[in-house]
A protein has these predicted regions:
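A local structural motif
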Residues: 1-9, 87-99, 112
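Extended ligand-binding regions for polar small-molecule ligands
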Residues: 1, 60, 72-73, 78-80, ...
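Periplasmic-binding protein-like
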Residues: 48-56, 128-167, 187-197
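Bilobed "Venus flytrap"/periplasmic-binding protein-like clamshell domains
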Residues: 32, 53-105, 120-122
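Alpha-to-beta junction loops
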Residues: 2-4, 10, 20-29, 73, ...
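Ligand-binding clefts/hinges and TM-proximal coupling segments of bilobed small-molecule sensing domains
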Residues: 83-98, 134-137, 168-197
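Acidic, polar ligand-binding/catalytic clefts
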Residues: 2-68, 141-146
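A ligand-binding cleft/hinge motif common to bilobed small-molecule-binding domains
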Residues: 14, 31-39, 85-88, 114-147, ...
């Protein structure tokens, strides 16, 4: 695309408002393209797929089911699809909402959260570091009602030309092999979810 970019780090819940008020031009933050979000913004074609992964302390008996989390503390990123999912699926859980995944992870390490739920890539990273050494993955989901069409770049609805340019750039890196090269360098599995075809 040959465009100069400047990155802004924002709290998750401030991303869509920042886009809609022209503080940023795109959201490139592993945001799922969901019907709810499409009510206020547009998305590029998906560029990867990332299911949600449940993580618990090793040896814990907590299960990611409505009955399994009854009365238990589930930690999620506030205003995320993971928050929406556990709010709908686990009505009897004590849902703790955090402004960052790092805060949620720290609460689990401190024993204040029984079950974490976040995207698989983030949780895999947590499990591979010292802070996650006493934790284990206990299940994943990619329920399309909550996870939508995949991870895409968010743009304002009226920015059709920018969306088309971004789609062309995504298509080019998939066709020229750059996407696969990055995938293979950083991930142990194919994150494309079929988006590289």
């Amino acid at each position: 695309m040959k465009r100069e970019c400047r990155f802004e780090q924002l709290d998750w819940e401030g991303l869509i408002p920042a886009l809609k008020t022209n503080k940023v031009d795109v959201i490139l933050a592993s945001m799922n393209d969901t019907p709810e979000r499409r009510e206020s913004i547009a998305f590029t074609d998906p560029y990867y797929s990332n299911p949600g992964l449940f993580v618990r302390a090793a040896g814990s008996k907590v299960e990611p089911t409505a009955e399994g989390v009854k009365g238990k503390v589930v930690g999620v990123l506030r205003a995320s699809i993971f928050d929406n999912y556990v709010t709908a699926k686990f009505p009897d859980a004590d849902i703790q909402r955090f402004t960052s995944q790092e805060d949620a992870n720290a609460a689990a390490v401190a024993g204040r959260v029984d079950l974490l739920f976040a995207d698989k890539i983030v949780m895999d990273g947590f499990l591979q570091h010292d802070e996650g050494k006493n934790f284990e993955a206990v299940g994943e989901t990619d329920d399309p009602e909550y996870f939508g069409a995949g991870i895409a770049i968010g743009v304002r609805k009226e920015d059709n030309a920018l969306r088309e340019d971004l789609n062309a750039a995504l298509k080019a890196i998939k066709e020229n092999g750059a996407y696969k090269k990055v995938n293979d360098k950083y991930f142990k599995y194919d994150i494309s979810g079929g988006t590289t075809q």
